[in-house]
């Protein structure tokens, strides 16, 4: 089966056998063989060969091609949404919004490139000072499984726009989405070698990340893998490394007038996408006392009624499956471990169908747990921590190596301004779901959550480097020579 796209040709893999499975029914969605080191090398070489012509292509022509890609995505939106749902387990309504985000990424990237890069000039003494931006060359893009279309797209589109050529390695759990996305690029007329696809797991990823022909690597995924890449790229300052990783995100709740609005916002923050967004709330900080008790009682009651089901079920579920049976098992074991350390299950996470990666929402009160693990449990498992006062809430919110997202539900603007200053996160929301983000704003965090701001408006910053020039049409003597020189 031809599963890799290298130098404008579809090729069969020569590496390990791969399958992607429907997370609910466990049927085979895609099968093939991964790319081995030789094929990875061929992909990097193809990108290097294509780079000079692509980088010299006028910006407006590159934009035209990207706009044709967006139009192709629109024309194939239903097909792509279904494949995303089938392979990830997320409901069709959510898959459709992902495709829309992929389409919109083109216009956002063009706007960002024009505003944040491009060319600027001005007079400086007897010369002209010019600022330009140039592409790095050949970059690798590693994609995650939770948004297998949108998140890699957030690297690939700005990278190509800036004039780079790309070798794309998607998650081994979502190869079919990647294959269909590549076909949309091909339909849009992308030249051979400009974007190459190598499918595979660890073997393929290690070969690509270690390739000496790369000028950079853009990654969205787990902190564990991101840390490995960071170590691997250590001592290579000549290469650009952009990492967007996870978070142990806190959502602090104060007593608010509209309790149901707070409950809805918490659910959207913690359980959207079955908890498989890097900005999902992992820790819910609730005040001690009667109001906090009432909030949790209502949260548990509503969460217990959330519809969970297959991606194409009707009526549509709120939550689909997590990505795989192994992911579901890991989450259930994490819940068991926390309960064993003293956590109180307010709503136990369950697996309603044996052999399916469907999970119901889980809510644990971990206030009494000593040495709580600072870990991102990537699924519908929410930890509740009761706090005594706002200062204690902020201390608890910041008690993490991560720094991706933090949120506050409060009727007090003064409280939010304090939270904004004292919290440690790249995204800080007030009375909005933690998973909400503006495409015109930077997306990313600090600490173990990564560097740079991939997948959003600021992606232009790491896809091209600035070049400063002093220019004059001819060589001429200055009006006054430097002391000690005579001509």
UniProtKB/Swiss-Prot annotation:
NAD(+) binds at residues 221-226. The gene is astD. It catalyses: N-succinyl-L-glutamate 5-semialdehyde + NAD(+) + H2O = N-succinyl-L-glutamate + NADH + 2 H(+). Belongs to the aldehyde dehydrogenase family. AstD subfamily. The keyword Ubl conjugation does not apply. The active site is at residues 244, 278. This is N-succinylglutamate 5-semialdehyde dehydrogenase. Its EC number is 1.2.1.71. Induction: By arginine, under the control of ArgR. One of its GO terms (molecular function) is succinylglutamate-semialdehyde dehydrogenase activity. The lineage of its organism: Bacteria, Pseudomonadati, Pseudomonadota, Gammaproteobacteria, Pseudomonadales. Keywords: Arginine metabolism, NAD, Oxidoreductase.
């Amino acid at each position: 089966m031809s599963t890799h796209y290298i130098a404008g040709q579809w090729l069969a893999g020569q590496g390990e056998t791969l399958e992607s499975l429907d997370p609910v029914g466990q049927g085979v969605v895609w099968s093939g063989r991964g790319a081995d080191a030789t094929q990875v090398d061929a992909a990097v070489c193809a990108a290097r060969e294509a780079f000079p012509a692509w980088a010299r292509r006028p910006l407006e022509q590159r934009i035209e091609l990207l706009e044709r890609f967006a139009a192709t995505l629109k024309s194939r939106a239903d097909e792509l949404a279904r494949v995303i749902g089938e392979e990830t387990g997320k409901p069709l309504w959510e898959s459709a919004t992902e495709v829309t985000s992929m389409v919109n990424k083109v216009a956002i990237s063009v706007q960002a490139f024009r505003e944040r890069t491009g060319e600027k000039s001005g007079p400086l003494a007897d010369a002209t000072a010019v600022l330009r931006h140039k592409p790095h060359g050949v970059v690798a893009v590693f994609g995650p499984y939770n948004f297998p279309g949108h998140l890699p797209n957030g690297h690939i589109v700005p990278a190509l726009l800036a004039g780079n050529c790309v070798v794309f390695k998607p998650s081994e759990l979502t190869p079919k989405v990647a294959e269909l996305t590549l076909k949309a690029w091909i339909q849009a007329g992308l030249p051979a070698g400009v974007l190459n696809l190598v499918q595979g797991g660890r073997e393929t990823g290690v070969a690509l990340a270690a390739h000496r022909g790369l000028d950079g690597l853009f990654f969205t995924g787990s902190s564990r893998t991101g840390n490995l890449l960071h170590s691997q790229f250590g001592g290579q300052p000549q290469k650009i490394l952009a990492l967007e990783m996870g978070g142990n995100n806190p959502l602090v709740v104060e007593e608010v007038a509209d309790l149901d609005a707070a409950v809805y916002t918490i659910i959207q923050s913690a359980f959207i996408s079955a908890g498989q967004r890097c900005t999902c709330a992992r820790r819910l900080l609730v005040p001690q006392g009667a109001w906090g008790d009432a909030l949790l009682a209502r949260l548990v009651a509503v969460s217990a009624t959330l519809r969970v089901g297959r991606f194409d079920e009707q009526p549509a579920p709120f939550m689909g499956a997590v990505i795989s049976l192994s992911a579901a098992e890991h989450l259930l074991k994490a819940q068991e471990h926390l309960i064993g350390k003293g956590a109180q299950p307010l709503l136990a996470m369950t697996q309603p169908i044996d052999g399916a990666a469907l999970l119901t929402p889980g809510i644990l009160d971990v206030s009494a747990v000593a040495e709580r693990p600072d870990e991102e449990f990537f699924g519908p498992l929410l930890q509740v921590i009761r706090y005594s006062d706002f200062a204690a809430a902020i201390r608890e919110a910041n008690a993490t190596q991560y720094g991706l997202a933090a949120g506050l539900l409060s009727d007090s603007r003064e409280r939010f301004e304090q939270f904004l200053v004292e919290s440690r996160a790249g995204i800080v929301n007030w009375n909005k779901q933690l998973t909400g983000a503006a495409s015109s704003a930077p997306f990313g965090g600090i600490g173990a959550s990564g560097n740079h701001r991939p997948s959003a408006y600021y992606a232009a910053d790491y896809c091209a480097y600035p070049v400063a020039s002093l220019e004059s049409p001819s060589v001429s003597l200055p009006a006054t020579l430097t002391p000690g020189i005579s001509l």
